[in-house]
C-alpha cells in the first residue's frame, strides 16, 4: 500500500498522463465520420418526429390497456411499415398476477368515461353542482387503473392518506378520502383497510406551487387479489383543493364520482422494428423508448417514441438511397410499456445478454445486445419547460466505452448547430450526467449491457396535464434525434480501426476519471482518513491494473468476465433488475429498520434526477456486481471507489443477508 505522499505523486503522474492522452484525442476527428453524421442530420426531420408525437398523444396509452394496443397498431406499426421497415407487434400477459422479475404486471384497464362533481356543500344554500373532473376534458384527472363504479359521499381530508397514522381518530367508512399521497397507497389505506368508497387526490403544497392549476398524473395499480376491494380515484388541481377546503370549513361537502371502466386480464404490447445487419445480424444495437403514458402526455414519452420512429425512417431512407451502406450489426428498435414491457421481453427471451467481445465478433455467434440507447423525454422546448438535455453515463458495473462514444457524438452534434425550420432557436447546452435510474435502460444495465438514457430535467410539466404537444420543439427533436441515430449507427457499422479508435479514447477517458477519483481520495486521506478512502485507493490501484490490459481487451471488466475462475466466490444475483419496492415486503423488523436507515442516509437531494446516489441506486449497482465471482470485500471497494463513499464490507454483507432472505441473491 502506498503512503500518502506516494499516492499524491502517483495521482499527479496519472493525471498528467490522462491530460496528455485527452489532448491528443481532442485534436483527432470525431468517431462518426463527418459525412455520415451530416447525411443523418440532414435527413432527420424534427417536424416529422414532432408530428409522430402529435399522433401518439391522441391515445390514452396505459400499460395493459386496449388503447395502448391501439396506438401501436394504428400509428406506430403502419408508419414503420410505410417507411419500408421490417416491423411487428409482440404481446405478453398482464393481469395483476404475472410477475416479471420482482414486478407484478398491471391489470388490463379499459377506460371509457369518468366524472367527479361537488354534489352539495352544507355551508351554501342552493349550490349548483360543480364539476371537478371530466375524463373527456382532462384525461389525467382520473386515476389510472380506477375500478368502474358510481358513488357519492362526504369528503374527509386525511393528509397524505398513506399511513395508518393518518386515520387515527378519523372515520372514512362510507366516505371519500381527500389526500395528497400516491393514489395506490391511499386506496390501500383508505379504501381497502378503512372502508372509504373512493379517493380524491390533490397536490402537496410543495409540489410546483407556481402552477396551481395543473392536474398531476396518479395511479391505483391494483393487484388481481385486490380487485373486489379496490375502488376509483380522481386528481384535482391545487386551486380546486383550496376551493374544497374553503367549502369544508363551512360544513360537510359531498362529491359524486362516476367511472365507466373495466379492470381484468390485459396484454403488454410492444412494437419491434429491425434494420438487419449484413455481417453479424445476431448482434444488436438496441434503441428503446416507452410508448405508454396518459393521453396528452407528450414529452413523457410520446416524444421518445416519435423520435424513434423518425430515426428508423431516416436510416431506412438513407440505406435505400445508397447514401449509407447497410449496417454490419442489426439495429433493433423497441417501443415498450415502461419497465413492465421491457421486463416481460427479457423474461421471455432469456438468451439476451451483452455481446462481450464486442470489437472482434465471431461469425454466427449467439444473439446478444452490444449496447442500448433509451430515449425518454427527448423533445422538450427547453425554454417553456425550463429544462436541459442530458444523457446518462453507464455505471462502473458495465463496460464504459458507451460513455466515450456518446460524449463524442454529443460534441459533434453541438458543433453542427442544428435547428428545425419550424422550431425554436433556443440555446442548447446539453450535458453528460452520472447514471440515473427511472427508465428502461435500467433493465438492460441489469443484463450487463452498456445502456444510456437520453432525456430532459428538470421539467415542471412532468407527469401533469401541462405536458402537451405545445411544450415540444422540432429543433430539439432534430438535435436529439440526429445525436441518437448517429451514435447507434457507429455501433452497428464500426470496423476494427474504428473500434480501436474508440477503445483508445475510452482508455483516456477512464484514466482521467480514475485520476479524478484518486485526487478526491488524496484529499480525504489528508483531511479525514477513513476506511472508505483506503478502499478507494486500493480499488484505484486495482482498476489501474485493469487499464493496462484494456487496450487489448476493450474494457476494464473483461479480465474478470473472461476468467471468473481466477477470482474469489461471492454473492450471485437471482433476479432481474431493477427491484420493485415489493421485493422487500415481509422483511423482518430489524432488517426493515436497517433499510429505512439506509434510505435516510442515502436520501435523494432532488425531486427530479438525483445529483448524488440514493439507496436504490447503490443497491442496484451492488447487485449488478453480484456475479458469483466478486467477493463482498471487492464489492465494497468498488462501490466506495465509484461513489466516493465509505461503504465497508459489513455494509455489503448486511445487504446481501437481507437480499438472500428475500431470495433475490444467493450467498
Please give the residue ranges for each predicted region.
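Noncatalytic luminal/extracellular "stalk/propeptide" segments of secretory-pathway proteins
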Residues: 30-32, 46, 54-173
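Second-shell loop/turn segments in exported
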Residues: 36-44, 57-68, 103-105, 142-146, ...
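Metal-dependent peptidase/peptidase-like ectodomains
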Residues: 44, 133, 233-234, 241-242, ...
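Extracellular/luminal Protease-associated
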Residues: 64-67, 71-74, 130-232, 296, ...
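Short helix-loop-beta-strand segments that form the rim/entrance of peptidase-like active sites
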Residues: 314-345, 375
Amino acid at each position: 500500500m502506498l503512503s500518502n505522499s506516494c499516492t499524491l505523486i502517483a495521482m499527479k503522474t496519472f493525471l498528467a498522463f490522462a491530460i496528455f492522452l485527452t489532448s491528443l484525442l481532442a485534436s483527432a476527428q470525431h468517431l462518426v465520420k463527418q459525412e455520415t453524421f451530416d447525411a443523418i442530420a440532414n435527413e432527420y426531420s424534427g417536424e416529422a418526429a414532432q408530428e409522430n408525437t402529435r399522433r401518439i398523444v391522441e391515445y390514452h396509452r396505459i400499460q395493459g390497456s386496449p388503447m395502448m394496443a391501439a396506438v401501436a397498431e394504428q400509428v406506430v406499426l403502419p408508419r414503420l411499415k410505410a417507411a419500408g421497415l421490417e416491423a411487428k407487434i409482440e404481446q405478453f400477459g398482464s393481469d395483476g398476477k404475472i410477475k416479471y422479475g420482482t414486478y407484478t404486471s398491471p391489470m388490463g384497464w379499459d377506460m371509457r368515461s369518468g366524472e367527479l362533481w361537488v354534489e352539495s356543500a352544507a355551508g351554501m344554500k342552493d349550490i349548483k353542482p360543480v364539476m371537478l373532473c371530466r375524463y373527456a376534458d382532462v384525461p389525467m384527472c382520473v386515476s389510472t387503473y380506477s375500478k368502474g363504479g358510481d358513488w357519492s359521499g362526504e369528503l374527509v381530508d386525511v393528509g397524505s392518506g398513506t399511513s395508518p397514522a393518518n386515520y387515527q381518530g378519523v372515520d372514512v367508512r362510507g366516505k371519500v378520502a381527500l389526500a395528497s399521497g400516491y393514489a395506490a397507497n391511499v386506496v390501500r389505506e383508505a379504501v381497502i383497510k378503512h372502508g372509504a368508497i373512493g379517493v380524491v387526490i390533490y397536490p402537496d403544497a410543495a409540489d410546483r406551487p407556481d402552477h396551481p392549476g395543473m392536474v398531476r398524473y396518479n395511479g391505483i395499480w391494483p393487484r388481481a387479489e385486490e380487485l373486489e376491494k379496490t375502488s376509483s380515484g380522481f386528481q384535482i388541481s391545487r386551486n380546486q383543493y383550496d376551493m374544497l377546503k374553503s367549502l369544508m370549513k363551512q360544513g360537510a361537502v359531498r362529491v359524486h364520482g362516476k367511472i365507466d371502466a373495466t379492470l381484468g386480464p390485459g396484454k403488454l404490447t410492444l412494437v419491434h422494428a429491425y434494420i438487419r445487419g449484413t455481417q453479424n445480424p445476431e448482434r444488436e444495437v438496441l434503441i428503446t423508448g416507452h410508448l405508454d403514458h396518459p393521453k396528452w402526455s407528450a414529452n413523457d414519452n410520446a416524444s421518445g417514441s416519435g423520435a424513434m420512429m423518425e430515426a428508423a425512417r431516416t436510416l431506412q431512407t438513407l440505406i435505400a438511397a445508397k447514401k449509407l451502406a447497410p449496417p454490419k450489426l442489426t439495429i433493433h428498435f423497441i417501443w415498450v410499456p415502461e419497465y413492465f414491457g421491457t421486463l416481460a421481453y427479457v423474461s421471455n427471451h432469456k438468451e439476451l445478454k451483452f455481446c462481450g467481445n464486442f470489437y472482434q465478433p465471431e461469425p454466427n455467434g449467439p444473439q446478444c445486445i452490444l449496447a442500448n440507447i433509451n430515449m425518454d423525454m427527448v423533445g422538450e422546448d427547453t425554454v417553456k419547460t425550463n429544462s436541459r438535455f442530458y444523457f446518462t453515463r453507464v455505471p462502473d458495473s458495465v463496460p464504459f466505452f458507451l460513455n466515450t462514444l456518446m460524449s463524442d457524438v454529443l460534441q459533434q452534434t453541438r458543433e453542427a448547430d442544428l435547428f428545425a425550420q419550424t422550431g425554436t432557436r433556443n440555446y442548447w447546452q446539453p450535458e453528460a450526467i452520472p447514471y440515473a435510474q427511472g427508465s428502461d435502460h435500467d433493465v438492460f444495465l441489469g443484463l450487463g449491457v452498456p445502456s444510456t438514457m437520453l432525456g430532459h430535467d428538470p421539467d415542471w410539466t412532468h407527469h401533469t396535464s401541462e405536458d402537451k404537444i405545445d411544450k415540444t420543439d422540432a429543433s430539439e427533436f432534430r438535435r436529439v434525434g440526429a445525436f441518437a441515430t448517429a451514435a447507434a449507427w457507429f455501433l452497428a457499422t464500426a470496423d476494427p480501426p474504428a473500434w480501436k479508435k474508440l477503445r483508445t479514447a475510452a482508455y483516456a477517458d477512464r484514466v482521467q476519471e480514475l485520476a479524478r477519483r484518486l485526487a478526491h481520495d488524496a484529499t480525504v486521506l489528508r483531511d479525514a482518513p477513513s476506511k472508505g478512502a483506503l478502499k478507494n485507493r486500493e480499488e484505484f490501484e486495482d482498476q489501474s491494473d485493469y487499464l493496462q490490459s484494456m487496450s487489448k481487451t476493450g474494457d476494464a471488466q473483461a479480465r474478470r468476465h473472461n476468467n471468473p475462475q481466477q477470482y474469489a466466490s461471492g454473492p450471485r444475483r437471482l433476479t432481474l433488475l431493477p427491484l420493485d419496492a415489493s421485493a422487500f415486503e415481509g422483511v423482518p423488523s430489524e432488517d426493515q429498520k436497517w433499510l429505512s436507515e439506509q434510505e435516510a442516509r442515502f436520501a435523494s437531494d432532488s425531486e427530479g434526477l438525483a445529483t448524488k446516489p440514493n439507496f436504490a441506486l447503490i443497491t442496484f449497482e451492488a447487485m449488478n456486481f453480484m456475479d458469483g465471482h466478486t467477493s463482498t470485500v471487492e464489492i465494497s471497494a468498488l462501490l466506495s471507489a465509484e461513489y466516493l463513499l465509505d461503504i465497508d464490507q459489513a455494509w455489503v454483507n448486511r445487504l446481501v443477508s437481507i437480499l438472500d432472505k428475500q431470495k433475490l441473491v444467493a450467498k
